[in-house]
Amino acid sequence: MTVDAAATPAEAPATNGHGDAHSTASFTALTLGSIGVVYGDIGTSPLYALREAVTAASSSGEAAPHAVMGVISLILWALIVVVTLKYVVILLRADNHGEGGTLALMALAQRGVTRGASIIVLLGIISGALFYGDAVITPALSVLSAIEGTKLVTAAFDPYVVPLTVIILAALFAVQARGTAKVAAFFGPIMLIWFLVIGIAAFPPILRHPEVLWAINPVNAVSFMLHHGIVGFITLGAVFLAVTGAEALYADLGHFGKRPIQTAWLFVVLPSLALNYLGQGALIIADAKALENPFFLMFPEWALIPMVALATVATVIASQAVITGAYSLTRQAIQLGLLPRFEIRHTSEAHSGQIYIPRINKLLLASVVLLVLLFKSSSALASAYGISVTGTMVVTAMMGFVVIWKVWRWSPLAAGALIAPFLFLDLTFLSANLLKVLEGGWVPLALGGFVMTLMYTWRRGSRLLFEKSRKLEFPLADLVAMLEKRPPQRVPGTAVFLTSDPLSAPTALMHSLKHYKVLHEKNVILTIETAPTPRIDPSERVRLEQISPTFSKVTLRFGFMESPNVPRALAIARKLGWQFDIMSTSFFLSRRALKPAAHSGMPRWQDHLFITMSRSANDATDYFQIPSGRVVEVGTQVTI
């Protein structure tokens, strides 16, 4: 007998991390919230993007007006084509049950293919790994570029730029454990002020040099690329700094919804960014020396200190969005079987998406501070930026093609015609950024490569371990038949055996029979599955199957953005007729001690890496939120 759970009020869908359910939140609040969370990264790019791009274009050392016009034109059209057309118009439609992001896109693409699913997973691993490189560089570069504005007030601040940056970043990571719910409400209004200020500040230089508006014509961008050869190609790597953060539009789709994100971009963010880049360009055309720091030099001297303060707050907000994204991506990766279980703490009782992962927080803090101390300036660090983001964009375009073809059911020619121009542009930007590998671009590549190795090793090792365990374990159906024919001594209560393979007898059950030679009155084989969707409807959470008078199978399904809570999910099973009492129930878990084998299917070094990752995994009792007083752990040794 198989029974599906009915929806119950006790198991309401979880709300998202940064806002209430869309049905209760106003459109204006969601739009304002998206300005604060989604656009922090791309919104702080004017601090350094144009400066670095014009510097790259000025091979002779002088910022020639035609070069400045060409760079501005490239930036404006990158914002229009990459951000507006690719993300705002097309990719925001490719949602996985309302959620976005590369792993959500990977899960969506997997559902549409029967062959080649492993390639989709590999693309997802590459994209996810590269994001961590971005998550390390963004806080370091953003905060450093804001603090550098103090040098324009007085040169005496110069020696304190790096220490101040480190202090601010350390404070930012230190408060993560307390959650950001109380201050997150201010992110939107602060970033709205930021966008209004940087847009308005551009008017005086534009009015003094209105010819800069001619940069809106794409002919300037094309002419610049045609006449500058390799210099133009190198400049593209710096131009891309203006669109870093575009992935956040798609990644935060589930938090705010498509229309609020689109509205914020088209009516607030894009106009402000375009005006600011035009204003900086006009300033450099008027005075080539302004290239030193055109963003802050647009403001009068009396406004420098307030602007440095506002820029610092804006960059902290941008950094917070990336840090939160790293937590969210890690939870998704754990649920999708790409990383071992980490300790996940919920920082809000109201919003399940507001989480804190101590191990990730420590690794990010150490990496970010190391980058600041290593590169010391935003100009040096800008060389390291871009590769991870362009790599992610290339992968997103590839998976987007699969979704449009297989899920939306377009013809391959039509899907290719739509995606090919964006993929070509992304590959061009990636090629330009690869020229910066020796200057610092190796940093995100090294970080991404390390995380990619971890993800690939964990997935491959887990699969090999599963296959080996299935060969060694006894079929569950045969064991149940034997126990029904010759039942051992019964003890009162319910035993729940947690297993990843519902077809095989759990190791904990076999050890219980071998050592205690008793069987509980009721025995449940519990399997926890991760669905290829962000969240699971309560009506699909539990599947209960009676396989004999004393044995039943229970399958709990969770989305890849949910944190599994076994007791809460089992409460649904009670409503299906299962007489479940937590105080008379024992949970049996097997803890494996892994040893490398001579022929495991993986290289020796990968065996040892997998074993190390397995040992560092968070305890299943804590991860699945099972009451520790009701748990019995059985140790087993397995060779892989």
From Swiss-Prot:
- The record lists its disulfide bonds as none
Note the superkingdom of the native organism.
Bacteria
Report which reactions are catalysed by this protein.
Answer: K(+)(in) + H(+)(in) = K(+)(out) + H(+)(out)
Q: Extract the ranges annotated as region (Disordered).
A: 1-20
Keywords noted in UniProt: Cell inner membrane, Cell membrane, Ion transport, Membrane, Potassium, Potassium transport, Symport, Transmembrane, Transmembrane helix, Transport
Q: Which GO terms describe its molecular function?
A: potassium ion transmembrane transporter activity; symporter activity
Query: By its UniProt entry, which PANTHER family does this protein fall under?
Result: LOW AFFINITY POTASSIUM TRANSPORT SYSTEM PROTEIN KUP, OSMOTIC STRESS POTASSIUM TRANSPORTER
The protein's name is: Probable potassium transport system protein Kup 3
